[in-house]
């Protein structure tokens, strides 16, 4: 009977061992599944964070580019207005100088003869030359009119 008891006990031990082995395998599988899910969640979180960071960087870059564009437009407009103002004042000053010189020359012409008349004409010519030079400098003349006075090297 001893052999029968030993055989019975050996079977029981084998059954318990198999049961514990199956429990351990089940626990390991559960832990592996939990680790897998946790890793997937961490990867998804990292992906989402990276996407958010990239989107924020893109928006910041667009805002910076727009601000630079706006600033450039403002600066360009201010420069254009300043140039127009300067050109207008130069036209007025040149015109005033020309008119004053013209009047002075006319007065000298009317009031004197000979040498004084020639001097007045020369002054008038010089004033006109100065006026033309100012106009030429600011690009307010037709190139055809000034070919005799201001030769250019443009080809």
From Swiss-Prot:
Sequence repeats: 53-63, 64-74
Record's keyword terms, sorted: Repeat
Compositionally skewed regions (Polar residues) per UniProt: 97-120
Compositionally biased tracts (Low complexity): 40-78
Gene3D superfamilies assigned to the protein according to its UniProt record, in alphabetical order: Apolipoprotein (1.20.120.20)
Region ranges (2 X 11 AA approximate tandem repeats of T-A-Q-A-A-K-E-K-T-Q-Q): 53-74
Keyword field contains Lipid biosynthesis: no
Record InterPro entries: LEA1/2/D7/KIN2
Similarity comment: Belongs to the LEA type 4 family.
Listed name of the protein: Late embryogenesis abundant protein 2
Annotated source species: Cicer arietinum
């Amino acid at each position: 009977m001893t052999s029968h008891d030993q055989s019975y006990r050996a079977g029981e031990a084998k059954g318990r061992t198999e049961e514990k082995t199956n429990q351990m395998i089940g626990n390991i599988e559960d832990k592996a599944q939990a680790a897998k899910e946790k890793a997937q969640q961490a990867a998804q979180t990292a992906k989402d964070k990276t996407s958010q960071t990239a989107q924020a960087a893109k928006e910041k870059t667009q805002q910076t580019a727009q601000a630079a564009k706006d600033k450039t437009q403002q600066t360009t407009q201010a420069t254009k207005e300043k140039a127009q103002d300067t050109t207008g004042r130069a036209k007025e000053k040149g015109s005033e100088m020309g008119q004053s010189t013209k009047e002075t020359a006319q007065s000298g012409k009317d009031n004197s003869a000979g040498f004084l008349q020639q001097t007045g004409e020369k002054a008038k010519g010089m004033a006109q030359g100065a006026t033309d030079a100012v106009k030429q400098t600011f690009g307010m003349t037709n190139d055809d009119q000034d070919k005799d006075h201001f030769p250019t090297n443009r080809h």
